[in-house]
Amino acid sequence: PDSNGARYYMNHQVWRPNHDKRGIGGDQVMMALSSWNLYYDYTGDESVLENMQYMADYYLAHSLSSSSCKWPDLPFPYNDSVEYGNYDGDMILGKGFLQPDKAGSFGFELVHLYKKTGNEKYLEAAIKIANTLAGKVQPGDNDHSPWPFKVNAETGEPGAIVDQEVWYEGMSKDIGKKRAIIKKSDYATNWTATLGLFDELIALQKGVSIAYRKAFEITLNWL
């Protein structure tokens, strides 16, 4: 275990004997769950299923945006204070920013885990993720995906880089003082798992199937 009691891979994206200071990768937990899901199906190794539950339980307990946020009940992809024990933001943009595509991936893996264990908490969390994403979906265009790549969970504003600087408090005032190049994080294409999340919940007849079907069609048409 790491210094906060969690297993090392729940805090870090790189293994180094002298203790790497970077937090986890944005899709790290979801990719591990996806791989373990396939491996468990192949081997039936119960220790693999136990590890899947450990990762999902820890991430659920330490990563979700508040239900009062504009983007509620979604996991933050990064632990800004690496060994503090919570995931609270984005590796580049900092605290408060999440990545909707990673949330969809996590929800998809939670459904797989629910189907393997029968544990309703995984299904309930997946439904909350799907509800938020379905409620936020937009048609998209050449410059905007149906959901932004990065968004501030509390304010609902997409993440932004100004003159190659990441967003910071007071940036809007600085923009007004100079000619600045602004690049918002409005575009991503990693939506396959999100489509899978909607598809799984529709098949299970859980959650709000009408909203999921609409979001599925909007996203598929955009892709």
Task: Describe each model-derived feature in a short phrase.
Residues 1-223:
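Glycan-recognition and catalytic cores of secretory/periplasmic carbohydrate-active enzymes
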